[in-house]
Design a protein with these regions (language model features):
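Contiguous beta-strand/loop segments that form the cofactor/metal-binding neighborhood of enzyme cores
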Residues: 179, 185-261, 291, 295-308
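C-terminal helix-rich "cap/oligomerization" subdomain common to oxidoreductases
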Residues: 1, 66-69, 104, 222, ...
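Basic phosphate/pyrophosphate-binding loop/patch that engages nucleotide-derived ligands
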Residues: 108-116, 130-146, 246-247, 251
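Predominantly a Rossmann-like dinucleotide-binding segment in NAD(P)-dependent oxidoreductases
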Residues: 123-208, 335
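Hydrophobic residues in well-ordered beta-strands that form the structural core
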Residues: 53, 91-92, 117-119, 229, ...
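N-terminal Rossmann-like dinucleotide-binding module
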Residues: 1-47
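Beta-strand-loop-alpha-helix segment that lines the small-molecule cofactor/substrate pocket
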Residues: 61, 66-73, 77-124, 139
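Conserved SAM-binding strand-loop segment of SAM-dependent methyltransferases
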Residues: 49-55
Length: 335
């Protein structure tokens, strides 16, 4: 089955999506939509497909089966709903949108229209992260007790000042937590389960933006485990994401995309990591050089379309991270 894809958005992430689609047999980018003529025309020249500057004629492009949203986060639900009403399957970049209210509206419309909805959390497809979930699920470290998750990244001032939407409440929904930290929020929920209690503080410590560039949250999981989450874009020069999970029988440490340590009460004889290098230097740059994670997420979504199954991260799964981010933001306003 030939899957023809339309891309919404003219930025770096839409280029990532286009490169990822090119690597999938039977998939083709046939149309691009963006409000910046220079950017969307560049994507069209670089990757093929018709360029549109208006959403309505883009969605009417007759040879599409699905769209991938790479637009500002706060536009996802509105654009996704419009696509679903045209019978198009919708795969959106993270987060699904900037509020659970908008997420719910998008989920409901896709269900009403009978189209698939997915959210791109590419970490779920990376080998060591999948293995982390498997090992913890199998009880390798016993009952999880403590989690320390650190997203201490750096973005220069131009990252915000050169964009009309980054670091804004209206279109980014927040700052370092909902944009950069949301991948790790999703990872924690996927691996360890629901969070039932939150205490938090957020602040703009370095950047002159209306939302936070730093967030700290204390999490209580339904399992009884306790966690500390840090997310910042103010930690020069930027450090790899690090997640340490300690259980009754030992500790597993993930650094960026790789397991770097498995320390157990009883000697562990298996491999520590199954990969040699991280896929992308996210700690210092938003540009995705290695598209394997995105390609796997898009392939999974196409498989769901072709076989009428659910993608690994469907709309309801994607909503979970936004719900926890909202809870952290609410907790940060309490004294």
């Amino acid at each position: 089955m030939k899957i023809r894809v339309g891309l919404i958005g003219g930025g770096n992430i839409s280029d990532t999506h286009a490169r990822a689609v090119k690597g999938i047999p039977g998939a083709e980018v046939v149309a691009h939509y963006g409000t910046n003529a220079e950017k969307v025309n560049h994507l069209s020249r670089e990757h093929g497909g018709v360029a549109y500057r208006d959403l309505e004629p883009f969605l009417a492009h007759r040879s599409m089966e699905m769209v991938i949203l790479g637009s500002p986060s706060g536009a996802h639900a509105q654009q996704g709903i419009a696509a679903a009403r045209q019978g198009l399957h919708v795969l959106t970049e993270k987060p699904i949108d900037i509020s659970t209210e908008r997420a719910d509206a998008l989920i409901a419309e896709c269900e009403r229209a009978g189209v698939k909805l997915g959210v791109t959390f590419q970490d779920r497809f990376k080998p060591d992260i999948r293995r982390l979930k498997q090992l913890i699920g199998e009880g390798l470290i016993g009952k999880p007790l403590l989690v320390d998750a650190r997203v201490k990244w750096y973005r220069p001032p131009a990252y915000y000042s050169d964009s009309r939407w980054r670091g804004t409440k209206a279109l980014d929904g927040g700052g370092a937590l909902i944009n950069q930290g949301v991948h790790t929020v999703d990872l924690l929920l996927w691996v360890l389960g629901d969070v039932i209690n939150v205490k938090a503080r957020t602040a703009a410590m370095l950047h002159k933006i209306e939302v936070e560039d730093t967030a700290l949250a204390l999490l209580e999981f339904a399992s009884g485990a306790l966690g500390l989450l840090q997310a910042t874009t103010a930690a020069y020069p930027g450090y790899p994401r690090r997640v340490e999970i300690t259980g009754t029988e030992g500790t597993i440490i993930l650094e960026q995309d790789r397991i770097i340590a498995i320390n157990l009460r009883n000697p562990y004889e298996g491999p520590v990591s199954t990969v040699e290098t991280d896929q992308n230097p996210s700690s210092t740059s938003p540009v995705v050089s290695d598209v394997r994670g995105h390609q796997s997420a898009i392939e999974d979504f196409i498989h769901a379309i072709e076989h009428n199954t659910q993608p690994i991260c469907d709309g309801r799964e994607g909503r979970r991270s936004v719900a926890l981010v909202e809870a952290i933001y609410r907790a940060s306003t309490k004294t």
